[in-house]
Amino acid sequence: MGQLHFITKLLDIKDTNIQIIDVVNRDSHKEIIAKLDYDAPSCPDCGSLMKKYDFQKPSKIPYLETTGMPSRILLRKRRFKCYHCSKMMVAETPLVKKNHQIPRIINQKIAQKLIEKISMTDIAHQLAISTSTVIRKLNDFHFEHDFSRLPKIMSWDEYAFTKGKMSFIAQDFDNLNIITVLEGRTQAVIRNHFLRYDRAVRCQVKIITMDMFSPYYDLAKQLFPCAKIVLDRFHIIQHLSRAMSRFRVQIMNQFERKSHEYKAIKRYWKLIQQDSRKLSDKRFYRPTFRMHLTNKEILDKILSYSEDLKHHYQIYQLLLFHFQNKDPEKFFGLIEDNLKQVHPLFQTVFKTFLKNKEKIVNALQLHYSNAKLEATNNLIKLIKRNGFGFRNFENFKKRIFIALNIKKERTKFVLSQA
Protein backbone atom coordinates (compact mmCIF):
# COMPACT_ATOMS: atom_id res chain seq x y z
CA MET A 1 0.00 0.00 0.00
CA GLY A 2 2.92 2.30 0.71
CA GLN A 3 4.20 1.92 -2.85
CA LEU A 4 0.76 2.71 -4.28
CA HIS A 5 0.68 5.87 -2.14
CA PHE A 6 3.97 7.01 -3.66
CA ILE A 7 2.64 6.23 -7.14
CA THR A 8 -0.25 8.59 -6.39
CA LYS A 9 2.22 11.34 -5.46
CA LEU A 10 4.39 10.62 -8.49
CA LEU A 11 1.39 10.95 -10.81
CA ASP A 12 0.44 14.21 -9.05
CA ILE A 13 -3.04 12.91 -8.19
CA LYS A 14 -4.06 15.19 -5.33
CA ASP A 15 -7.59 13.87 -4.83
CA THR A 16 -7.43 11.81 -1.61
CA ASN A 17 -10.66 10.05 -2.60
CA ILE A 18 -8.87 8.27 -5.46
CA GLN A 19 -7.29 5.01 -4.38
CA ILE A 20 -4.82 3.23 -6.67
CA ILE A 21 -5.37 -0.51 -6.53
CA ASP A 22 -2.82 -1.83 -9.00
CA VAL A 23 -0.50 -0.95 -11.91
CA VAL A 24 -0.54 -3.34 -14.88
CA ASN A 25 2.15 -3.32 -17.59
CA ARG A 26 0.66 -4.00 -21.03
CA ASP A 27 2.66 -4.48 -24.23
CA SER A 28 2.05 -0.94 -25.49
CA HIS A 29 1.08 0.99 -22.36
CA LYS A 30 0.60 1.00 -18.60
CA GLU A 31 -2.80 0.73 -16.95
CA ILE A 32 -3.33 2.28 -13.53
CA ILE A 33 -6.34 0.65 -11.90
CA ALA A 34 -8.02 2.97 -9.40
CA LYS A 35 -11.35 3.73 -7.79
CA LEU A 36 -13.07 6.93 -6.69
CA ASP A 37 -15.11 6.60 -3.53
CA TYR A 38 -16.27 8.84 -0.69
CA ASP A 39 -19.17 9.25 1.74
CA ALA A 40 -22.62 9.64 0.26
CA PRO A 41 -23.67 13.29 -0.24
CA SER A 42 -27.11 14.87 0.03
CA CYS A 43 -29.46 14.53 -2.90
CA PRO A 44 -29.31 17.66 -5.12
CA ASP A 45 -33.05 17.32 -5.90
CA CYS A 46 -34.80 16.53 -2.60
CA GLY A 47 -32.02 17.07 -0.05
CA SER A 48 -32.25 13.59 1.46
CA LEU A 49 -29.08 11.70 2.29
CA MET A 50 -28.09 9.46 -0.61
CA LYS A 51 -26.63 6.00 -0.19
CA LYS A 52 -23.79 4.19 -1.90
CA TYR A 53 -25.12 2.11 -4.77
CA ASP A 54 -22.43 0.53 -6.98
CA PHE A 55 -19.43 1.41 -9.16
CA GLN A 56 -19.60 2.67 -12.70
CA LYS A 57 -17.91 0.89 -15.58
CA PRO A 58 -14.21 1.96 -15.51
CA SER A 59 -13.55 5.29 -17.25
CA LYS A 60 -10.51 5.10 -19.55
CA ILE A 61 -8.67 8.32 -18.74
CA PRO A 62 -5.48 9.02 -20.78
CA TYR A 63 -2.58 10.21 -18.66
CA LEU A 64 1.00 11.42 -18.99
CA GLU A 65 3.77 8.99 -19.87
CA THR A 66 5.39 7.04 -17.05
CA THR A 67 8.83 5.43 -17.55
CA GLY A 68 8.63 6.30 -21.24
CA MET A 69 5.36 4.43 -21.88
CA PRO A 70 1.85 5.80 -22.49
CA SER A 71 -0.39 5.48 -19.46
CA ARG A 72 -4.08 5.50 -18.79
CA ILE A 73 -6.12 5.36 -15.61
CA LEU A 74 -8.98 2.87 -15.39
CA LEU A 75 -11.05 4.78 -12.84
CA ARG A 76 -14.13 3.17 -11.35
CA LYS A 77 -16.39 5.90 -9.98
CA ARG A 78 -18.82 5.31 -7.11
CA ARG A 79 -22.49 5.80 -7.90
CA PHE A 80 -24.95 7.12 -5.32
CA LYS A 81 -28.70 6.64 -5.19
CA CYS A 82 -31.40 8.56 -3.40
CA TYR A 83 -34.01 6.07 -2.23
CA HIS A 84 -36.45 8.91 -1.65
CA CYS A 85 -36.65 10.29 -5.22
CA SER A 86 -34.60 7.64 -7.10
CA LYS A 87 -32.00 10.22 -8.18
CA MET A 88 -28.70 8.67 -9.33
CA MET A 89 -25.40 10.54 -9.09
CA VAL A 90 -21.79 9.69 -9.97
CA ALA A 91 -18.83 10.64 -7.79
CA GLU A 92 -16.84 13.64 -9.05
CA THR A 93 -13.13 14.44 -8.87
CA PRO A 94 -10.94 17.46 -9.68
CA LEU A 95 -8.77 15.10 -11.75
CA VAL A 96 -11.21 15.35 -14.64
CA LYS A 97 -14.22 17.57 -15.34
CA LYS A 98 -17.72 16.21 -15.03
CA ASN A 99 -18.81 14.33 -18.18
CA HIS A 100 -15.26 14.65 -19.56
CA GLN A 101 -12.66 12.00 -20.21
CA ILE A 102 -9.52 14.11 -20.77
CA PRO A 103 -7.91 15.02 -17.42
CA ARG A 104 -6.90 18.57 -16.58
CA ILE A 105 -3.19 17.68 -16.54
CA ILE A 106 -3.41 16.50 -20.18
CA ASN A 107 -5.12 19.77 -21.17
CA GLN A 108 -2.29 21.67 -19.49
CA LYS A 109 0.26 19.57 -21.35
CA ILE A 110 -1.48 20.24 -24.67
CA ALA A 111 -1.20 23.99 -23.99
CA GLN A 112 2.53 23.60 -23.24
CA LYS A 113 3.09 21.55 -26.39
CA LEU A 114 1.28 24.11 -28.57
CA ILE A 115 4.01 26.61 -27.67
CA GLU A 116 6.55 24.31 -29.32
CA LYS A 117 7.02 24.24 -33.09
CA ILE A 118 5.51 20.79 -33.64
CA SER A 119 2.38 19.67 -35.45
CA MET A 120 -0.90 19.04 -33.68
CA THR A 121 -0.84 15.45 -34.95
CA ASP A 122 2.51 14.92 -33.21
CA ILE A 123 1.13 16.42 -29.99
CA ALA A 124 -1.82 14.02 -30.17
CA HIS A 125 0.51 11.08 -30.79
CA GLN A 126 2.82 12.00 -27.89
CA LEU A 127 -0.08 12.31 -25.44
CA ALA A 128 -2.04 9.31 -26.81
CA ILE A 129 -5.13 11.40 -27.57
CA SER A 130 -6.99 12.38 -30.74
CA THR A 131 -6.06 15.31 -32.97
CA SER A 132 -9.58 16.67 -32.44
CA THR A 133 -8.84 17.01 -28.72
CA VAL A 134 -5.77 19.11 -29.51
CA ILE A 135 -7.77 21.30 -31.91
CA ARG A 136 -10.47 21.83 -29.28
CA LYS A 137 -7.80 22.99 -26.84
CA LEU A 138 -6.36 25.29 -29.52
CA ASN A 139 -9.81 26.82 -29.97
CA ASP A 140 -9.91 27.61 -26.25
CA PHE A 141 -7.19 30.22 -26.82
CA HIS A 142 -8.47 33.72 -27.55
CA PHE A 143 -6.16 36.61 -28.42
CA GLU A 144 -7.64 40.08 -28.28
CA HIS A 145 -5.94 43.01 -29.97
CA ASP A 146 -5.04 45.92 -27.72
CA PHE A 147 -6.07 48.92 -29.81
CA SER A 148 -4.94 51.39 -27.14
CA ARG A 149 -1.20 51.14 -27.84
CA LEU A 150 1.37 50.51 -30.54
CA PRO A 151 5.15 50.15 -30.22
CA LYS A 152 7.44 53.02 -31.19
CA ILE A 153 9.39 50.74 -33.53
CA MET A 154 7.50 48.30 -35.73
CA SER A 155 8.52 45.79 -38.41
CA TRP A 156 6.43 44.82 -41.44
CA ASP A 157 6.82 41.80 -43.68
CA GLU A 158 4.85 39.12 -45.49
CA TYR A 159 4.92 35.34 -45.59
CA ALA A 160 3.28 32.66 -47.73
CA PHE A 161 0.19 31.13 -46.12
CA THR A 162 -0.95 29.11 -49.12
CA LYS A 163 0.52 28.66 -52.57
CA GLY A 164 0.38 31.94 -54.46
CA LYS A 165 -1.09 33.88 -51.54
CA MET A 166 0.90 36.16 -49.24
CA SER A 167 -0.16 37.20 -45.75
CA PHE A 168 0.88 40.25 -43.71
CA ILE A 169 2.65 40.26 -40.35
CA ALA A 170 3.67 43.13 -38.05
CA GLN A 171 5.99 42.73 -35.07
CA ASP A 172 7.20 44.80 -32.14
CA PHE A 173 10.89 45.44 -32.86
CA ASP A 174 11.95 45.57 -29.20
CA ASN A 175 10.15 42.71 -27.42
CA LEU A 176 9.48 40.60 -30.58
CA ASN A 177 5.76 40.23 -29.82
CA ILE A 178 3.50 39.76 -32.83
CA ILE A 179 1.24 42.81 -33.25
CA THR A 180 -1.02 41.35 -35.91
CA VAL A 181 -1.25 38.64 -38.54
CA LEU A 182 -3.57 39.37 -41.48
CA GLU A 183 -4.73 36.89 -44.08
CA GLY A 184 -3.96 39.24 -46.98
CA ARG A 185 -1.31 41.88 -47.66
CA THR A 186 -3.39 44.22 -49.82
CA GLN A 187 -3.56 47.90 -48.90
CA ALA A 188 -7.27 47.62 -48.08
CA VAL A 189 -6.74 44.77 -45.59
CA ILE A 190 -3.83 46.50 -43.84
CA ARG A 191 -5.53 49.92 -43.82
CA ASN A 192 -8.78 48.55 -42.39
CA HIS A 193 -6.90 46.89 -39.55
CA PHE A 194 -4.71 49.81 -38.48
CA LEU A 195 -7.52 52.36 -38.80
CA ARG A 196 -9.08 50.63 -35.80
CA TYR A 197 -6.37 52.37 -33.76
CA ASP A 198 -6.93 56.03 -32.87
CA ARG A 199 -4.81 58.55 -34.75
CA ALA A 200 -3.10 59.56 -31.49
CA VAL A 201 -2.02 55.94 -30.97
CA ARG A 202 -0.77 55.65 -34.55
CA CYS A 203 1.24 58.84 -34.15
CA GLN A 204 3.25 57.14 -31.39
CA VAL A 205 4.96 54.94 -34.01
CA LYS A 206 8.29 56.55 -34.90
CA ILE A 207 10.02 53.93 -37.09
CA ILE A 208 8.76 51.18 -39.42
CA THR A 209 11.22 48.70 -40.91
CA MET A 210 10.17 46.89 -44.08
CA ASP A 211 11.34 45.26 -47.31
CA MET A 212 11.55 47.08 -50.63
CA PHE A 213 7.84 46.57 -51.35
CA SER A 214 6.56 49.83 -52.82
CA PRO A 215 2.82 49.44 -51.98
CA TYR A 216 3.76 49.68 -48.29
CA TYR A 217 5.45 53.10 -48.58
CA ASP A 218 2.45 55.38 -49.15
CA LEU A 219 0.26 53.26 -46.90
CA ALA A 220 2.71 53.56 -44.01
CA LYS A 221 2.87 57.34 -44.44
CA GLN A 222 -0.93 57.64 -44.45
CA LEU A 223 -1.44 55.47 -41.39
CA PHE A 224 1.61 56.56 -39.38
CA PRO A 225 2.34 60.21 -40.24
CA CYS A 226 5.14 60.56 -37.66
CA ALA A 227 7.00 57.39 -38.63
CA LYS A 228 10.25 57.10 -40.58
CA ILE A 229 10.47 54.22 -43.07
CA VAL A 230 13.68 52.19 -42.81
CA LEU A 231 14.34 49.74 -45.64
CA ASP A 232 16.00 46.45 -44.83
CA ARG A 233 19.69 46.63 -45.75
CA PHE A 234 19.81 43.02 -46.92
CA HIS A 235 17.21 43.68 -49.62
CA ILE A 236 19.03 46.80 -50.83
CA ILE A 237 22.22 44.80 -51.36
CA GLN A 238 20.18 41.98 -52.88
CA HIS A 239 18.98 44.34 -55.62
CA LEU A 240 22.58 45.27 -56.43
CA SER A 241 23.73 41.67 -56.34
CA ARG A 242 20.99 40.50 -58.69
CA ALA A 243 21.82 43.24 -61.19
CA MET A 244 25.48 42.18 -61.12
CA SER A 245 24.53 38.52 -61.55
CA ARG A 246 22.26 39.19 -64.54
CA PHE A 247 24.87 41.41 -66.18
CA ARG A 248 27.53 38.70 -65.69
CA VAL A 249 25.26 36.17 -67.44
CA GLN A 250 24.81 38.54 -70.40
CA ILE A 251 28.59 38.96 -70.74
CA MET A 252 29.10 35.20 -70.38
CA ASN A 253 26.61 34.48 -73.18
CA GLN A 254 28.68 36.61 -75.58
CA PHE A 255 31.29 33.82 -75.64
CA GLU A 256 31.01 30.37 -77.18
CA ARG A 257 29.64 27.79 -74.76
CA LYS A 258 32.73 25.61 -75.17
CA SER A 259 35.19 28.47 -74.85
CA HIS A 260 37.55 28.87 -71.90
CA GLU A 261 36.13 32.31 -71.08
CA TYR A 262 32.55 31.02 -70.88
CA LYS A 263 33.51 28.15 -68.58
CA ALA A 264 35.62 30.37 -66.30
CA ILE A 265 32.93 33.04 -65.86
CA LYS A 266 30.29 30.36 -65.27
CA ARG A 267 32.34 28.35 -62.77
CA TYR A 268 33.69 31.23 -60.67
CA TRP A 269 30.56 33.38 -60.56
CA LYS A 270 30.70 33.61 -56.76
CA LEU A 271 33.99 35.50 -56.88
CA ILE A 272 32.32 38.26 -58.91
CA GLN A 273 29.43 38.51 -56.48
CA GLN A 274 31.64 38.44 -53.38
CA ASP A 275 32.98 41.50 -51.57
CA SER A 276 36.51 41.92 -52.94
CA ARG A 277 37.86 42.58 -49.42
CA LYS A 278 36.83 39.08 -48.38
CA LEU A 279 38.59 37.20 -51.17
CA SER A 280 40.85 34.40 -49.93
CA ASP A 281 44.58 34.71 -50.60
CA LYS A 282 45.22 30.97 -50.36
CA ARG A 283 46.65 29.38 -53.49
CA PHE A 284 45.05 26.21 -54.87
CA TYR A 285 45.29 24.23 -58.08
CA ARG A 286 42.51 25.36 -60.45
CA PRO A 287 41.57 22.79 -63.14
CA THR A 288 39.93 25.45 -65.34
CA PHE A 289 43.22 27.36 -65.63
CA ARG A 290 45.54 24.33 -65.07
CA MET A 291 47.65 26.20 -62.54
CA HIS A 292 47.78 27.24 -58.88
CA LEU A 293 45.98 30.55 -58.34
CA THR A 294 44.46 32.62 -55.55
CA ASN A 295 40.88 33.88 -55.79
CA LYS A 296 42.18 37.38 -56.51
CA GLU A 297 44.27 36.11 -59.44
CA ILE A 298 41.29 34.18 -60.84
CA LEU A 299 39.13 37.30 -60.61
CA ASP A 300 41.74 39.40 -62.44
CA LYS A 301 41.82 36.86 -65.27
CA ILE A 302 38.01 36.76 -65.54
CA LEU A 303 37.73 40.57 -65.57
CA SER A 304 40.34 40.77 -68.32
CA TYR A 305 37.94 38.97 -70.69
CA SER A 306 35.57 41.97 -70.84
CA GLU A 307 36.08 45.68 -70.22
CA ASP A 308 32.34 46.13 -69.61
CA LEU A 309 32.37 43.41 -66.96
CA LYS A 310 35.42 44.98 -65.32
CA HIS A 311 33.87 48.47 -65.32
CA HIS A 312 30.57 47.34 -63.80
CA TYR A 313 32.37 45.13 -61.29
CA GLN A 314 34.37 48.13 -60.05
CA ILE A 315 31.19 50.22 -59.64
CA TYR A 316 29.51 47.30 -57.86
CA GLN A 317 32.41 46.91 -55.42
CA LEU A 318 32.58 50.65 -54.73
CA LEU A 319 28.86 50.71 -53.95
CA LEU A 320 29.30 47.77 -51.56
CA PHE A 321 32.19 49.59 -49.89
CA HIS A 322 30.28 52.87 -49.39
CA PHE A 323 27.17 51.02 -48.25
CA GLN A 324 29.04 48.98 -45.64
CA ASN A 325 30.79 52.13 -44.45
CA LYS A 326 27.33 53.72 -44.15
CA ASP A 327 28.25 56.74 -46.23
CA PRO A 328 25.05 57.80 -48.05
CA GLU A 329 26.65 60.84 -49.75
CA LYS A 330 29.32 58.81 -51.55
CA PHE A 331 26.91 55.94 -52.19
CA PHE A 332 24.34 58.13 -53.98
CA GLY A 333 27.04 60.33 -55.50
CA LEU A 334 28.48 57.29 -57.28
CA ILE A 335 25.01 56.26 -58.45
CA GLU A 336 24.22 59.72 -59.87
CA ASP A 337 27.61 59.98 -61.62
CA ASN A 338 27.23 56.62 -63.39
CA LEU A 339 23.47 56.50 -63.95
CA LYS A 340 23.64 57.22 -67.70
CA GLN A 341 26.80 55.20 -68.41
CA VAL A 342 25.86 51.85 -66.86
CA HIS A 343 23.94 48.95 -68.41
CA PRO A 344 20.09 49.15 -68.31
CA LEU A 345 20.06 46.38 -65.71
CA PHE A 346 21.99 48.64 -63.35
CA GLN A 347 20.04 51.72 -64.44
CA THR A 348 16.79 50.13 -63.25
CA VAL A 349 18.28 49.43 -59.82
CA PHE A 350 19.88 52.88 -59.58
CA LYS A 351 16.59 54.62 -60.43
CA THR A 352 14.84 52.56 -57.76
CA PHE A 353 17.48 53.59 -55.21
CA LEU A 354 17.19 57.29 -56.14
CA LYS A 355 13.40 57.10 -55.95
CA ASN A 356 13.67 55.69 -52.41
CA LYS A 357 16.69 57.75 -51.39
CA GLU A 358 15.24 58.99 -48.09
CA LYS A 359 14.36 55.47 -46.95
CA ILE A 360 17.80 54.09 -47.90
CA VAL A 361 19.51 56.98 -46.08
CA ASN A 362 17.47 56.05 -43.00
CA ALA A 363 18.70 52.47 -43.38
CA LEU A 364 22.31 53.68 -43.45
CA GLN A 365 21.99 56.15 -40.59
CA LEU A 366 19.85 54.03 -38.24
CA HIS A 367 20.71 50.59 -36.87
CA TYR A 368 17.22 49.14 -37.32
CA SER A 369 16.51 46.35 -39.82
CA ASN A 370 14.02 43.60 -40.58
CA ALA A 371 16.38 40.84 -39.41
CA LYS A 372 14.34 40.02 -36.30
CA LEU A 373 11.12 39.70 -38.28
CA GLU A 374 12.86 37.55 -40.90
CA ALA A 375 13.88 35.21 -38.06
CA THR A 376 10.26 35.16 -36.91
CA ASN A 377 9.18 34.29 -40.45
CA ASN A 378 11.55 31.32 -40.40
CA LEU A 379 9.80 30.07 -37.26
CA ILE A 380 6.42 30.55 -38.94
CA LYS A 381 7.63 28.52 -41.93
CA LEU A 382 8.80 25.84 -39.49
CA ILE A 383 5.36 25.68 -37.85
CA LYS A 384 3.72 25.46 -41.27
CA ARG A 385 6.16 22.83 -42.55
CA ASN A 386 5.89 20.64 -39.45
CA GLY A 387 2.11 20.76 -39.69
CA PHE A 388 2.21 19.94 -43.46
CA GLY A 389 0.36 23.20 -44.09
CA PHE A 390 -2.81 24.66 -42.60
CA ARG A 391 -6.20 24.80 -44.28
CA ASN A 392 -7.72 27.03 -41.61
CA PHE A 393 -6.11 30.47 -41.36
CA GLU A 394 -7.49 31.12 -37.86
CA ASN A 395 -5.89 27.92 -36.53
CA PHE A 396 -2.60 28.91 -38.18
CA LYS A 397 -2.86 32.41 -36.70
CA LYS A 398 -3.46 31.01 -33.20
CA ARG A 399 -0.45 28.70 -33.51
CA ILE A 400 1.70 31.71 -34.45
CA PHE A 401 0.49 33.77 -31.48
CA ILE A 402 0.85 30.86 -29.04
CA ALA A 403 4.32 29.89 -30.26
CA LEU A 404 5.74 33.41 -30.51
CA ASN A 405 3.87 35.59 -27.99
CA ILE A 406 3.77 33.18 -25.06
CA LYS A 407 7.17 32.90 -23.41
CA LYS A 408 8.04 29.45 -22.11
CA GLU A 409 10.01 29.24 -18.87
CA ARG A 410 13.07 27.04 -19.07
CA THR A 411 14.32 24.74 -16.35
CA LYS A 412 18.08 24.31 -16.40
CA PHE A 413 19.44 21.12 -14.91
CA VAL A 414 23.03 21.35 -13.65
CA LEU A 415 24.75 17.99 -13.86
CA SER A 416 27.24 17.31 -11.09
CA GLN A 417 30.68 16.14 -12.13
CA ALA A 418 32.14 13.03 -10.54
Where are these regions (language model features)?
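Short, positively charged, Gly/Tyr-enriched micro-motifs
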Residues: 47, 60-154, 158-165, 202-205, ...
